[in-house]
């Protein structure tokens, strides 16, 4: 097996030689206007052997380690290019199928996900079940060799351009809420599925809401055990939060940009203190991410909480430094409008604090009304 240092050096050289073909680094969600460029970039990555780096070779991967994959992500973040086109596909859906999928599901989906034949979206959150995902009400009722799915999902990233989705739905309404959920692989072109874009206060429409009306989903699209979807979903979300480690690079760049913005301006004592504190914390989180390597569940929550809270505070400080300019249509205004969403996406800051308190610090569990 190739050493990580050698692999990282080769990856950096390949990125430098091919960077001109890449779209800008858009993070976890590809904006609709960059889908074509993102697909082309993913195909180029796949052809060069940098897609599914830590996946088994029999499923189209390189058979390397998670540390090799982290090295690839780091080099991409430093270069300012996407490490994958479809994070939901390669990190979430792919990881779930590798761990819980039948041989038939793995054969059908994994190679197709690496080469962009299958593009995935996440169908978890609902209007009344976001952070409290266990309260979801979308139902999937068994009817012979199929499930009939009815309900609504929201905050679905990439729903408009995805042809597959990972879906959590309630299959046993009589069971305790976490025990009656199942996990499905859902074709997005089934009759009865309607996708509508959601306009955000930034003016963008990164997310969609998805409606299911008498959708007939084949029973063999169930992933993992019947009524065992909560465990599958939690494994998926841990992968999502672990993927945030490369956001440290983006945070570092944002702080460098803010330092340049502050040059030549008369900052207050409070603003100088806030800037120094953010830079110090950013250095600490960078060291933590580099030391951590593959991130376990609790550490992923710690890193996710720290980075998103720092992103929020840095956007506020940048707006304060910019002064009246922050009210104009530009990067400062966009950053201030976008920042609050980071404390919600991928699990709210409140949820991350509960995970850290209960699993890392051993504090009493938060009271659950449904268990009373």
Regions found by a protein language model. Give the residues of each.
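Amphipathic, small/basic residue-rich leader segments at the start of a protein or domain
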Residues: 1-87, 108, 112, 244-245, ...
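Glycine-rich phosphate/cofactor-binding loops in nucleotide/flavin-utilizing enzymes
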Residues: 8, 67, 71-72, 92, ...
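A structural signal for short hydrophobic beta-strand segments in well-ordered beta-sheet cores
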Residues: 138-141
């Amino acid at each position: 097996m190739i050493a990580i240092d050698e692999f990282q050096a080769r990856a950096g050289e390949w990125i430098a030689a091919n960077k001109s073909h890449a779209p800008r680094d858009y993070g976890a969600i590809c904006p609709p206007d960059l889908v074509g460029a993102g697909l082309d970039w993913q195909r180029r990555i796949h052809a060069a052997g940098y897609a599914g780096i830590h996946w088994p070779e029999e499923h189209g991967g390189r058979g390397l380690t998670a540390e090799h994959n982290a090295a690839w992500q780091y080099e991409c973040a430093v270069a300012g290019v996407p490490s994958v086109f479809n994070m939901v596909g390669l990190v979430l859906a792919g990881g779930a199928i590798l761990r819980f999928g039948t041989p038939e599901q793995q054969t059908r989906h994994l190679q197709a996900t690496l080469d962009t034949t299958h593009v995935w979206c996440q169908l978890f959150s609902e209007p009344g079940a976001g952070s409290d995902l266990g309260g979801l009400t979308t139902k999937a009722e068994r009817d012979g060799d199929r499930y009939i799915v009815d309900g609504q999902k929201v905050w679905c990233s990439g729903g408009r351009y995805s042809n597959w989705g990972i879906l959590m739905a309630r299959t046993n309404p009589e069971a305790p809420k976490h025990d009656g959920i199942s996990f499905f692989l859902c074709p997005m072109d089934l009759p009865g599925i309607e996708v509508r874009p959601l306009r955000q206060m930034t003016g963008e429409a990164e997310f969609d809401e998805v409606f299911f009306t008498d959708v007939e989903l084949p029973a063999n699209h169930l992933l993992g055990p019947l009524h065992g979807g909560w465990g599958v979903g939690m494994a998926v979300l841990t992968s999502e939060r672990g993927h945030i480690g490369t956001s440290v690079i983006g945070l570092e760049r944002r702080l460098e940009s803010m330092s340049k913005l502050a040059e030549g301006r008369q900052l207050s004592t409070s603003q100088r203190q806030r800037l120094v504190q953010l830079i110090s914390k950013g250095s600490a989180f960078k060291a933590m991410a580099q030391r951590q390597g593959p991130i376990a569940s609790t550490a992923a929550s710690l890193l996710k909480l720290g980075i998103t809270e720092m992103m929020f505070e840095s956007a506020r400080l940048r707006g304060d430094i910019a002064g009246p300019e922050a009210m104009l249509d530009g990067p400062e205004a966009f950053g201030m409008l976008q920042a609050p969403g980071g404390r919600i996406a991928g699990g709210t800051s409140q949820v991350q604090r509960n995970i850290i308190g209960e699993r890392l610090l051993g504090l009493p569990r938060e009271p659950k009304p449904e268990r009373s």
